[in-house]
Amino acid sequence: MKLTDRIENGIVILEPKGKIMGGPDASLLNEKIHEYIESERKKVVIDLSQVEWMNSTGLGILISGYTKLRNRDGVLKLANVTDKI
């Protein structure tokens, strides 16, 4: 998995590409989400348009980020979710 990130109008946009499964690649996404949360960013969008596959580890990362942001009065949204995901 590759990951690009940027900030537009105060909104963090993360764009993973490839498969989100366990291991170092999934850790990268998890770390990046939590890095932005710790830096007080309250709005995160994860664009899944280029994600080919996601297992339960990947789903757990998304749920963890969503929960942590919600607990800090923030929001995590998923964009461009394919039927496969």
Give the positions of each predicted feature.
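Short beta-strand/loop segment at the start of cytosolic alpha/beta domains
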Residues: 1-15
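Amphipathic alpha-helical interaction surfaces in cytosolic regulatory modules
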Residues: 20-85
